[in-house]
């Protein structure tokens, strides 16, 4: 049976068996890592994946509101509304949320990476980050012209808001962010650090406390 804590669409998930005085207990690997306050966002940002991340963060806050949550991101991005539910939860809960890019953090994934607690935003050395303007999904968009205009105006407002927040978290000027997100803008881990998307590039666990 698939665990509710398990990232979606990953196929076979390893199990971990722990021994205790009460016998053996088996966990899927993601549930076991959740005990260490590690939350994964793997794959596209969807309503389903966002709901799992939000639920895990709220659970970890209830377990210990004063201990950091470690949020690992390997995502090409996805839904803005789903991503913003994660973003608002990160700000709402009491624990600091340390973010770590493993593989890639693109689009909404990059936004969530930058939104971690300042001083606690990391990327592994061969990961990559990509920022761009919001996308309108659904090439077959149809409907009344007036409704399409309404959606277009809303997307312009969303773009402005996302640029403001990215400027806030990166420390870049709004004008710089507006220019840099006009097209896909890829960064290496070190370039992401220089831009202000993260605070440190990690090559080993020792680098976290160095």
Swiss-Prot record:
It is an enzyme of class 3 (hydrolase). The lineage of its organism: Bacteria, Pseudomonadati, Pseudomonadota, Betaproteobacteria, Neisseriales. GO terms for biological process: protein quality control for misfolded or incompletely synthesized proteins. Signal peptide: none annotated. Its EC number is 3.4.21.92. The active site is at residues 107, 132. Cleaves peptides in various proteins in a process that requires ATP hydrolysis. Has a chymotrypsin-like activity. Plays a major role in the degradation of misfolded proteins. Its main location: cytoplasm. InterPro entries: ClpP, ClpP/crotonase-like_dom_sf, ClpP/TepA, ClpP_His_AS, ClpP_Ser_AS. Coiled coil: none annotated. This is ATP-dependent Clp protease proteolytic subunit. The gene is clpP. Fourteen ClpP subunits assemble into 2 heptameric rings which stack back to back to give a disk-like structure with a central cavity, resembling the structure of eukaryotic proteasomes.
